[in-house]
Every structure is written in C-alpha cells, then in structure tokens.
Amino acid sequence: MKVLYVCTELFPFLKTGGLADVSAGLAPALQAVGCEVRLLLPAFPAIANQALSTRPIASLPAGPMPWGPAPVLPPASLTLATLPGLELPVYLVQAPALYDRPGNPYLGPDGKDWSDNAIRFAALGWAGATLGQGLDPHWRPDVIHCHDWHSGLTPTYVRAFAAAKQATPATVFTIHNLAYQGLFAAAEVTRLGLPKSWFDIDGFEFFGKVSFMKAALRYADRITTVSPTYAREISSEAQGCGLDGLLRERANSLSGILNGVDDLIWNPATDALLPAPYDEHKLQGKTLAKRALQTKFGLEPRANALVFGAVSRLTEQKGLHLLPQVLADMVQRGGQLALLGQGDVALERAFVDAAIRYPGQVGVRIGYDEVTAHAVIAGADVILVPSEFEPCGLTQLYGLRYGTLPLVRRVGGLADTVVDCTLENLDEGSATGFVFDELSPAGLLSAVRRAFVLFRRPDEWLAVQQRGMGLRFDWLASAQHYLAMYQTLRPGAK
C-alpha cells in the first residue's frame, strides 16, 4: 500500500514541537509494517538545505479545474529528495517566494503569523492532492495521510477531484491539536482554488472565515486524533473548539490512536547525551544524570532533593501558569525545579524571577535544545505535565521510559498513559505516576505533595520507576493500528 505522509515538520531537520517527533517516528514505522511511504513537506530552508540529492518531478498544476480555477500560486514545483539518515523518499514543494524564509516556519520575525500563510499551506495541500492525481507519473498513493491544519486542504482538493468524477486516493487526517485551526479571511476562497459553493456551514466556512481544520474534518475519509481520550474530549462542547458538532456528526469516522516513542532517540540505555547509560535493572546512570542536571541548572547538589523537571512551551494550555504558585511549598519541602521552555513572556519572567528568589533550588533555561531536554528528562525525579488539555503528550512517555515519574493532569493522552499512585494502584502494581483532576494551584499541589510522600518510601518509588520503564509505547504498535485503518479504506473493504 502506497502512503503519502503530508506534514510540515520532521525531526531532526525542523522541529517546533511534537509534530516533528511524530513524523520521524510514525512514517518509518509505517514503512516497517509493510507500507510504501513517501513524505511531502514544504521546502523550508532547514529541510531543503540538508537534502543529499533532489530530482525534479513537475510543476504544480495551474489554470482551470472542473470546479473552477486552481490555487493562485507563485512559481511552485515538486522535487523528490533524499535526506541524511532517512531511508524514505521525501517530496519537497519548491516555492521560494513562499518558503525561503529564515527562522520559524509559521511565524515572522515579529512573532506573528506570516500574512500569506493561507497560500503557503494551500500550496502544500495542492501538492498532496495533485500527487494523488498522478503528478508524479512513477508513483501514485493509495492513501494520503495528512497532519494538522497546515495540510488540511489536501483532503478538500481530493474531494473536489472526486466530485468531478476523477479517481482519487483515500484520505486520512490526524488532529494533533484542535485549538490551532488555520483560519483565514473569506476573500481567500478564490485565490485558494476552493469550490465557492463549499464556503458555507456545511463546508469549510467557520464563523465567516475559511477554516483549514474544518475543511479537513469535513472532507477527509477518516479522522484520527493522537489518543482515545482526546477523541472523546473534542467531541464535547467544552473541548471541541466550536467543531464538536461536526465531530459528533462524523463520530463513525473518528478514532484515537496513541503516539509512540522513538526508541532510537529516547532510550536511556543507548542515549549518548547522558553521562552514563542506564535501564530499569541498573539505575546508577540515573543518579549520575541527576547530579549532572543539578550542576547544569545551578541547583544544590543534594541527592535527597526531589527534583521536578519541566520541558514545555510556557503557555496556559500546558498548565505551567500554575507552577509559580506552588513553588514556595515545593521548595519548603526540600524540592527543586529544573525548567526548560519558552513561550508566554509573562510566564518566562515569572520563572526567571523564581530562579532569583530561590537560588540553588530553582533553575530555569529559557529556550529549547535537545541536549538540555534529555538532561532534564533523565535527571529529574518527576516530570511535570499539568496541561489544561493534551491531545497525546510525548513528554510523559519520555519520563516513563527514563524512570522519571510523570505528574500529569487527567486529560487526553495523559489520562491514557499514566496510572495514578493511589493506594489501590500501588498495591496491585499498576501505578506509574501522579494524576490530578482540578486545573488549579490546589489541584497541582495535591499531586506534588503525594510525590513527596512516595519519595520518602524508596522501595515503593523504585517499584513505580521500574514499572514505568518497562512499558513500551512504540511506533510499530501505532503503525499497525494505522495500517488496519488504511486497509478499511481500500475499494471493496467492509
């Protein structure tokens, strides 16, 4: 089965968040379970400049289509590239006027969305749909799997071709975060090459705007999210971001499949970024990682300190606004904090101020880099993920793998992957972390206090550590679920 994987980020070439990790893990896993996979991405400089070779395929089609004009694009073409360390072929949408810009792929130097993001990502969608129509005469996908709003017009264009009685591949759309919807002015409809008659409440119109996310949810053959709980949550008014009605309407086409962890990158037994390797049977290396983390973040080198770690975007969605309000209690109990992240300026300032207020107990790095992320996740005793909502979450999975107990809120993928250290769960041997419900300082603090209690019981702590480290959230399991879904989309499948 030929699968075209459409996305905008790919680790280690370009990463702004977990989407890059998912692409790097899932696409090769799909190949490993028998799919013939090719990726499609914009030719952002961070990716295109690392290509080992490129071969021209075709210019993107222009002019009239059966439903009206094609998207109005600057010169754009498709090349087939090879990237270092990646065995999968990669199509790159070459459009220098759209993509040849430094820095963040979505934001300008002012930190705001590029004003032409609608056409930038319409070009990606158009490339995906026309590959489905045979743009590459040597390779045509059976399934096009699209990820997040940036690729949301791919299923829309595919449906437009299907409405014109042309043979089309099946389409799958995965929601990584429903809150980011790709909303643009209604005036963009003609320039985007979309059927004008579809700009209504039953199409891709959303409160008077074009919604790339709604377009995908309306026109994709199947919809997935990155955890079963998140699939249920977004079908409710509370977390549906205004699209819950459509998602309930499409309930039979919606499912949740958990993300996995790339064992080549996140494995303490082989992680070259750590002071020493370790596993669930030999944890001496974790002790060294903790000492190294304390040194790196300017924390007092106390072996008996309960070190909390956080690697996150600093936003209210991630629940990090609660943390400054519980730091006094955490430090008073002998705890420490090592935080790596960036985002909301006010939150950044709050954490920098906390590091000044609690020298030797709170260490903060504003920014992000992989080396420090590995240091925090390996060296901390507890990893904090107190999110307001969390489609899947990868940080808690990394924590489990590294023997760093996750402390999470019971939402989305966090609820699906972490078992609370209640007395009952400890007794039956299923506990893997700390879970709380109420999105408040009091809710977070209750879980923090329970972490201190368990930390004073080293034998029980070790048992929970080892249980989490023994779990495997691997991409092959996720890929098998996706493959089974793809197979239901074959012509004649029941």
Swiss-Prot record:
Keywords from the UniProt entry: Glycogen biosynthesis, Glycosyltransferase, Transferase
GO MF annotation, one: alpha-1,4-glucan glucosyltransferase (ADP-glucose donor) activity
One annotated GO biological process: glycogen biosynthetic process
Domain of life: Bacteria
Top-level EC class as recorded in UniProt: transferase
InterPro entries for this protein: GS/SS, Starch_synth_cat_dom
Family indicated by similarity: Belongs to the glycosyltransferase 1 family. Bacterial/plant glycogen synthase subfamily.
NCBIfam families attached to this UniProt entry: glgA, PRK00654.1-2
The protein, known as: Glycogen synthase
Lineage: Bacteria, Pseudomonadati, Pseudomonadota, Betaproteobacteria, Burkholderiales
